[in-house]
Amino acid sequence: MPGPWLLLALALTLNLTGVPGGRAQPEAAQQEAVTAAEHPGLDDFLRQVERLLFLRENIQRLQGDQGEHSASQIFQSDWLSKRQHPGKREEEEEEGVEEEEEEEGGAVGPHKRQHPGRREDEASWSVDVTQHKRQHPGRRSPWLAYAVPKRQHPGRRLADPKAQRSWEEEEEEEEREEDLMPEKRQHPGKRALGGPCGPQGAYGQAGLLLGLLDDLSRSQGAEEKRQHPGRRAAWVREPLEE
């Protein structure tokens, strides 16, 4: 590409000479040589300008390519997050929050990456354990005492445990009470009259007979242990009838 000064010099030479043909050719060559000698760095300057323009175009092109690449990366990350499981996204967000808390100095909770329902179950279980921990059996809730036993007959549940005792046990208890307190549940006047001594302190035949009958009934009751009460009553009646 010829320089502008060179073109101007050629135009001036042609205009000034005004002579056709080869008369003006040696003069034009001389003028070109003079201009080249006067401006030796003009061509170099133009070449540098061209290089700078070329570099500028390359830089702009590279910037455009980088912008397109970054936009494609953003689109790809959005696409990946869109096609990802929602639970994994939540876990990643929780991880980011936990990392921020660790950086700020906050302690991470014990329920890291745990199902919310399990957290509630464990919390209620821990509350129950703390409530019943080291507790006296008598101080526990009263409804536990009335709780229905597991796999038990409904009639047996409602029945009184004292009423389930056998008649033999009841007879044994009655005999023990009679041995300890033979005159229990008896009128005090009858005890005084039925004793070996009368109300005036005299011993009679009736008092002796009653004392003997009491002794016999006690001895027979001891021998006839665990016997039906009706049979025992029959043995007691025999000496009376005689």
Curated annotation (Swiss-Prot):
Residues annotated as signal peptide: 1-24
Keywords associated with the record: Amidation, Cleavage on pair of basic residues, Hormone, Repeat, Secreted, Signal
MF terms (GO), sorted A to Z: thyrotropin-releasing hormone activity
Modified residues (Proline amide): P86, P116, P137, P154, P188, P229
Location of the region described as Disordered in the Swiss-Prot/TrEMBL record: 63-205, 220-242
Tissues expressed in: Hypothalamus. Expressed in the hair follicle epithelium (at protein level).
Principal subcellular localization: secreted
Ranges annotated as biased composition (Acidic residues): 91-105, 168-178
Biological process according to GO: adult walking behavior; cell-cell signaling; eating behavior; histamine metabolic process; hormone-mediated signaling pathway; negative regulation of glutamate secretion; positive regulation of gamma-aminobutyric acid secretion; positive regulation of insulin secretion
Biased composition (Basic and acidic residues): 157-167
Intracellular or extracellular location(s): Secreted
Any single Gene Ontology cellular-component annotation: extracellular region
Biased composition annotated in UniProt, kind: Polar residues: 69-79
Lineage: superkingdom: Eukaryota
InterPro entries per record: TRH (IPR008857)
Function: As a component of the hypothalamic-pituitary-thyroid axis, it controls the secretion of thyroid-stimulating hormone (TSH) and is involved in thyroid hormone synthesis regulation. It also operates as modulator of hair growth. It promotes hair-shaft elongation, prolongs the hair cycle growth phase (anagen) and antagonizes its termination (catagen) by TGFB2. It stimulates proliferation and inhibits apoptosis of hair matrix keratinocytes.
Family named by the database record: Belongs to the TRH family.
Protein name stated in the entry: Pro-thyrotropin-releasing hormone
Lineage of source species: Eukaryota, Metazoa, Chordata, Craniata, Vertebrata
